[in-house]
Amino acid sequence: MEELNFKEEELKGFKEFNKGGYEGKILLYKPEILLKRFESFIMPFLNMDNKKYKLIEFSKMNQLENIIALPKQLVNIDNTFSGFTMKKYNAVTIDNLKDLNKNIDLFAKLFKNLDYLHNKDIIIGDVKNKNILVDNNNNPIFVDVDSMGINKFPQDHIDRGPAGSVRRIPNINKKFKSLDYKSLDKLLLLSLFVEKLADNKEPMVNKIYNSSLSKEAKEIMHEYIYSDKFNYNIDLAAVFENERTR
């Protein structure tokens, strides 16, 4: 993979695209390319040489370019690996979609793509609204690649923060204790869908039961939110596919 070299001073000329997560900032390197730069304080916790190798391995999996913003180039700042460049997409986050049928179609695609990614031994460890963009054809695009585990390499870190406001989405942390990452990611997607159904003006259960979801889907959503006996063996991808095609 091509490498770019910058001096720390040169970064001041780049516009800040957004503040990114706790681990770094995202800078606008070119109109279509972003630069993900890691903060120095997390360096002791990450094996950066390992991350560099992981990104090289990941760049070979170019089949997923329409789904994921792949790392394009490694970036060295003051002769130290400090980030990578990635493609900038003209898209909106899933929060911008209000139509229920479009949401069902989107989440059906998300579940299908998540299966595909997992079959490539890739784990999406940061499934949340701001990391999922939607293009003009209602196709999902995952944009957070820096936390992924690839093949024999583990994730660099695991976000152990709260799943979100209990008032808007279920507190799903307690449901994660005995699940593998694939199940966890599917539940995170289900949480996002439940959150999309909810609003602050109406109880979540009313919002679900007043929607045009099928009876089966409504019962699954209700059980997921309110029951500790949720059936984790449910084929959630099939549920969304049935909703999309019925």
Regions found by a protein language model. Give the residues of each.
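Conserved N-terminal boundary motif of the eukaryotic protein kinase catalytic domain
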Residues: 2-17
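Conserved alphaE helix
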Residues: 102-116
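ATP-binding glycine-rich loop module of kinase domains
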Residues: 13-70, 74
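Conserved structural core of kinase catalytic domains
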Residues: 66-106
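C-lobe/activation-segment region of protein kinase-like
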Residues: 141, 145-228
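Catalytic-loop of the protein kinase fold
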Residues: 114-135
